[in-house]
Amino acid sequence: MTVTDHREAMIEARAAVTDVREAMDAYAEEFAADVNSIRTDSRHRENIRDMRAAVDAYCESFATAVSTHHDETAALRADLEATAAAFDAYTTAFAADAAAMHDVSALHRDIEALREEFRAVTTDFEDYTTDEFAPAVGALHADAAETAASFTAKQEGFEAYRHDVHESAVPALTADIAATRADFDDTAASFAAYARAFYGHTDDATAQTDADDTTAQTDVLSGQATVTRAQPEEDDTPEDMVQCRVCEEYYQAITEPHLQTHEMTIDGYRDEYGEDVPLRPDDHA
């Protein structure tokens, strides 16, 4: 490159610098004008003041948030450290447990001791079964057999008593009562015949009068006899008792066990003597 070329280049550079300087001067003038305008404009000042207050508030809030974040970070770090310590302790305990599990000699000893206890308990149970339980069961069976035999003997005795009383004594007593009633009827008939024979030979008027008297007396005597026979069934009947139609005896109630002595049930008793047959004293009403 020649000197002329250098000179032209420098001239161009100077011209460019001059243009830049002029542009900078123009920009400086415009910037100064803008600054002056902003300084003189109160609205821009208020906006700047509000913006500065907002920036200050934000800075305070940001500082508070940063402090809170630092506190939370510290707490989280402490929790992490505690968790890490717990995991370390668990790892140590787990390793110890694993080592203990690998060593099964103690378990074998415990199992063998348990087997020995089972053998001892089995031996004791077998001894108890042979020496105490089996004899006790045998004695219990013997007592049960003796009790059953005693019950059987008592039942047979009761059956014999029932047979003697309800099948022998009661029918005999009923027959005696029927014979006594028949004798009483015969006596009443004989007395009436005697009265007719005694008053039958007088004159007509006297005979008529005597016959009327005899008839009246006979009626009275017959009525007395009838009343005497009917008295046990009506007037002398206890108010709190009821008569059995089979044996004609009086009881507080006609029950199934009593009817079984006559080989009869309550249904059969009602079929025989009617559905309204009294079974209790209150049934008369």
From Swiss-Prot:
Sequence repeats lie at residues 22-52, 53-84, 85-122, 123-155, 156-188, 189-220. It comes from the Archaea. Pfam families: Halo_GVPC (PF05465). InterPro entries: Gas-vesicle_GvpC_halobac. GO terms for cellular component: gas vesicle. Residues 22-220 are annotated as: 6 X approximate tandem repeats. Coiled coil: none annotated. It is found in: Gas vesicle. The keyword Repeat applies. Induction: In PHH4 (a deletion of the p-vac locus) not transcribed in exponential phase, transcribed from stationary to mid-stationary phase. Small amounts of longer transcripts that probably include gvpC-gvpN-gvpO and further downstream are also seen. Gas vesicles appear earlier when grown in static culture, possibly due to O(2)-limitation. Keywords: Gas vesicle, Plasmid, Repeat. One of its GO terms (biological process) is gas vesicle organization. Encoded in a 14-gene locus called c-vac which produces cylindrical gas vesicles only in the stationary growth phase. Confers stability, involved in shaping gas vesicles (GV), hollow, gas filled proteinaceous nanostructures. GVs allow positioning of halobacteria at an optimal depth for growth in the poorly aerated, shallow brine pools of their habitat. Expression of 2 c-vac DNA fragments containing 2 divergently transcribed regions (gvpE-gvpF-gvpG-gvpH-gvpI-gvpJ-gvpK-gvpL-gvpM and gvpA-gvpC-gvpN-gvpO) allows H.volcanii to produce gas vesicles. Belongs to the halobacterial gas vesicle GvpC family. This is Gas vesicle protein C2. It comes from Halobacterium salinarum (strain ATCC 700922 / JCM 11081 / NRC-1) (Halobacterium halobium). The gene is gvpC3.
